[in-house]
Every structure is written in C-alpha cells, then in structure tokens.
Amino acid sequence: MAFNDLLKQVGGVGRFQLIQVTMVVAPLLLMASHNTLQNFTAAIPAHHCRPPANANLSKDGGLEAWLPLDKQGRPESCLRFPFPHNGTEANGTGVTEPCLDGWVYDNSTFPSTIVTEWNLVCSHRAFRQLAQSLFMVGVLLGAMMFGYLADRLGRRKVLILNYLQTAVSGTCAAYAPNYTVYCIFRLLSGMSLASIAINCMTLNMEWMPIHTRAYVGTLIGYVYSLGQFLLAGIAYAVPHWRHLQLAVSVPFFVAFIYSWFFIESARWYSSSGRLDLTLRALQRVARINGKQEEGAKLSIEVLQTSLQKELTLNKGQASAMELLRCPTLRRLFLCLSMLWFATSFAYYGLVMDLQGFGVSMYLIQVIFGAVDLPAKFVCFLVINSMGRRPAQLASLLLAGICILVNGIIPRGHTIIRTSLAVLGKGCLASSFNCIFLYTGELYPTMIRQTGLGMGSTMARVGSIVSPLISMTAEFYPSIPLFIFGAVPVAASAVTALLPETLGQPLPDTVQDLKSRSRGKQKQQQLEQQKQMIPLQVSTQEKNGL
C-alpha cells in the first residue's frame, strides 16, 4: 500500500492523470485500424481472367466466350478458355487454362488494393494472408522485445521509440514498390504497435490509485472499439490502399512529438531503486495536480521509509526467465498464456474474415465495433462488482459457446449466423479488455511489463495460427468454427487457478504475491474454524454441558 499512499498524497486522480491518460490513450484509436487494416487494403474484389491480347470480343461473341462458368453460374476467377468457346466441337470440349494475361478486377468498391496491384489471387492467393501473418509475427516479436526493454529502460522511452517506428514504417509501407518491401514494413509496424498497446496500459495503470484501475482499463478498451468505427469511416472515405495506409500512419508522428512530455512511471523508478527520479516525478505530478505543499513534504528519506520493502526486494533485474524460475510466477505465466492465446486465436478467426459474411464490409466493420460498447460495459460492471476472475471466465465461455453453435447452424441462416458471430466477437473483445487489466494486476512491478509482453506474445501466436485453422474450411466449412469455439471454452476453466485482484494493491515484488496467497489460505482456515465452532457448541449442548 506504500506507493498507493504516495499517489494519494500527490493528488490521487488529478489534472495530471486526466491529461496523461488522454495523451497516452489517443493513439490507440489508430492502433485498432492497423490491426485489421488488411480487411480493406487487401480486399479481394470480383475478378476474372483477361482475354488474350489478340482477342476480338465483338467477333468472338463477347467476354462470355472466353470465360467458363462455375457451379453458381458465375465466371470463373482463375480459368479461361484457350480459344473462344462458341459451341463448336473443337472449342466445346471444356478445356481451360490459367489466366496467362492477368486479370480484370471490379474496381467499383476498391479502386486499388495490394491484391489488385500485385495480383495476389488464384495461385498467389496465399501471399495475401502471408502479409497479415507477417504483421502478426511482428506483433509477436515486438511484445517479446519491447516488453523486456520497457522493464529495463522505462515505459516512456520505449513509447517514444514505438510512436516513431510506427509512423515511419507505416508511411514507408504506403510507398512500398513491391510486395516484399511492403511486408517488411508491415512487420516493423506490428512490432511497435504491440509495444504501444502494453505500454499504454502499464504506464496509465501505474499512475492510478487502486479504485480507478478498472475504469482506465475499460476506457482503453472503449478507445480501441471506437478505432474500429474510425477504420470503417476512413476506409470508406479513402478507398485507395496506399492513401488509407498513410491516413492511419502519419498521425503517429504527432504522438511521437507530444510523447516527450510524458512523465515516466514513478512506480517503475522506485522498483528500479532510483529514488532521486522517483522523487522528481512525484513532485512534478504534485505541482500539476495543485498539491505543491504535499510534494514539498516528500524527500529521499521519506521515500526510503515508505518504500523500504520494495527497495529491499527489488535488487535483481527482471527478465523473461524469471517467469519460469519462480514457481509462483511460472503458474501465473502458464495460466495467463492460455487465456491470451485463446482470446486472440478466436478473435482474429472472426474479425479477419469480413468478406465471408456476404454483406457490406463497411457495415460489418461498424457492427463489430458497435457490439463492443455494450459488451465491454457489461464486462466493466462484472469486473467492478464480482471481480476480474468471473468476468474473464464468463467472456471466454460465452464466446466459445456462440462460435460452437454457429458451426452447427446451416449456412443459409445468414442473420442468425451473423448475429452469433457478432455476439461472440463482443465477448472476445470483453475478454481482451479483462485480460489486459488482469495481467497487469497479477504481475509484480519488477516484471509487470515483461509479463504483459509475454502475454501479448502468446496472443500473437494465436493470431498467427488462426489463419491456418481457417484453411481447414476447404475440407468441411464448419471445422474452423468448432476449433475457434472449443479453445476459449477450454481456456475458461483455467481462470479458476488464478487469484482475484479486485480491490487489491498492485504487487511490487514476488514476495507480495506469496503473501497474498498465504493471506488467502489463512482467511480460508479462519472461515473453516468459524464454521466448526457452532457445531462444537451444539454438540456440547446436546450432552447437557
């Protein structure tokens, strides 16, 4: 409780918290756009083979003479006749060939995408999904690397670097001359965006008192959801993929400029043993919050007394290996990894297939964003009233059930299937909201950012595996849905192994975690003893004593 008392002394939730939270959270609007950007920049418009250069369509009988029809009576996308198909014996054999002269695309909805510019269709169709997978690989690498660096160098320095990297790599991707260069810059964007997400949560949470952490976590979730609305609007207004890529990347230059005014986490300073910087940060916050007199009362000696436990126990450098060495941290790491993986695995299985719903992609994008608002509000109520653990369990379990039921319903029931998918997506968005907050509250300060980074890493593993599972639909259409639904249902059971953090102070050390666990065991023993006392009295009364 020592550091929380210091926060209250310098103003609790004051002007500084409101300003910094707003500035840190604002870029998340466009982070949501980057994560699902390829739904629009890599959209696949209707297309068919281009007839040979020497073809005379007016003489041959029109375009239909060169294009075979599929089972639905539509022109084939990847095949054409080698000669005009006019019903003669020579040309009526059904012999086809690939699109040797390229493709003709329907540009009415999407004037230009990476698919149409680099012909990522037919035999090259897998390259479209590869670009998104490489972006997620970047997110995975960024979560691992920058999560560790943030625990070593601080949250503020890493955020400044991440804003610049996102702005530069995103802008360069918009001017990529070929597919390979585009993928490289998208990977770099993914690395920095992963770090922005986890550093945003941590920096805000470490400057907030206990009773406000759930509010901040919910706010971050809502900003991300609003970013999905924003993407639909920007993509509709800017349909050209290069212009859209620029529109969601250039604003990060603004974030890079104002991020120099962020104040580093005093909690991180103290956990690193740098009391001079801790004092300076707290006094600066006190001035902004109008608590100069309270800030003046602070000194190195006061901090040494207040933070004696943290300074004694936080001597070692945090590393990812600590998550496996310590039994207490190892159990947390394994359980949280399963929750992160399951949430991301099912989430991206749904949101990266907007064209599969058979309706306007812009409309589905808006609906997917809209469902987050009530879903996250309900999650917020559960988090604050019942706790983090029930909220995490319910969101994963309900999401899995919705997806599993969706796999059973026949394909013709479009409205029901879409409704279940939207409901499942809302539950998974709530799960993301909860797991960010829950993870940050479970790990001690000395390794919190590393823990969040490793959790985000497991989430990216899920998002990378998800497209591979989607490919199993070629064998049976419902196989992906059964898998996407079963994983979160199974993972929901893991929440029973995690402690509740509602109303608990943030742990600063591993010792805090162990003390909390021992305190819970003692409380359970006392409750059992209280239940046994009336029974003993009742037995004595029956014996006439």
Swiss-Prot record:
SUPFAM superfamilies: MFS general substrate transporter. Residues 31-129, 178-180, 240-242, 353-362, 411-419, 472-478 are extracellular. Residues 522-531 have a biased composition (Low complexity). Expressed in kidney. In kidney, restricted to the proximal convoluted tubule (representing S1 and S2 segments). In brain, expressed in neurons of the cortex cerebri and hippocampus as well as in the ependymal cell layer of the choroid plexus. Changing residue 49 to A: Decreased cell surface expression level and PAH transport activity. Complete loss of PAH transport activity. The keyword Transmembrane helix applies. One of its GO terms (cellular component) is basal plasma membrane. Its main location: membrane. Residues 515-545 are annotated as: Disordered. One of its GO terms (molecular function) is prostaglandin transmembrane transporter activity. It is a multi-pass membrane protein. Residues 536-545 have a biased composition (Polar residues). Belongs to the major facilitator (TC 2.A.1) superfamily. Organic cation transporter (TC 2.A.1.19) family. This is Solute carrier family 22 member 6. It comes from Mus musculus (Mouse). The lineage of its organism: Eukaryota, Metazoa, Chordata, Craniata, Vertebrata. The gene is Slc22a6.
